[in-house]
Design a protein with these regions (language model features):
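A generic "folded-domain core" signal
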Residues: 19-157
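Bacterial N-terminal signal peptides that target proteins for export
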Residues: 1-9
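Hydrophobic h-region of N-terminal signal peptides that target proteins for export
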Residues: 10-20
Length: 157
């Protein structure tokens, strides 16, 4: 019995050392000019059909935006965000060529889903429209969104 206990202590120690570190928060509170704030996701890398590009989700109390270095194509109306296994939420509009906007009910739905979710699958389409390269997706972590949202609500009024 005694030798069995001494064998388990080193085994348990090695097991604890090999445990994965906690995942870091993927969201940052950013103060913007004019006194407002927004939440910025970590940037995700995807292809635009021709080259690698980045996409980032930005959230304010009234809007959810996806920004990219590449030019978006909304001609088919299929730009969307799907949180976990929820139904995908379609974008409302583009703001310029490089920003996809979700506002009103779409933004409210996404913000509620971001608080409860683990990941967001962002589906995008890029210009040029010919030859068409289809949609391209990037998965963004929602770890830390709720904590960042609460911080924004408390400190950015």
């Amino acid at each position: 019995m005694r030798s069995t206990v001494w064998w388990w202590i080193p085994a348990l120690s090695v097991g604890l050392l090999g445990a994965a570190p906690p995942e870091k928060d993927a969201w940052t509170l950013t103060k913007v000019q004019g006194g407002g704030c927004r939440l910025d996701s970590d940037k995700g890398t995807l292809t635009d059909g021709y080259q690698k590009t980045n996409a980032q989700i930005r959230v304010t109390p009234t809007e959810v935006r996806v920004v990219s270095e590449s030019t978006f194509d909304d001609s088919k109306g299929d730009l969307s965000i799907q949180v976990d296994r929820q139904e995908a939420v379609k974008a409302d509009a583009l703001d310029g060529a490089k920003v996809v906007v979700f506002k009103g009910p779409a933004a409210s739905t996404l913000i509620a889903q971001f608080k409860a979710g683990l990941k967001a699958n962002v589906t995008l389409r890029f210009w040029p429209t010919w030859p068409e390269t289809g949609t391209h997706s990037v998965v963004m972590s929602l770890i830390g969104f709720t904590r960042a949202w609460e911080e924004m609500q408390a400190s950015c009024r």
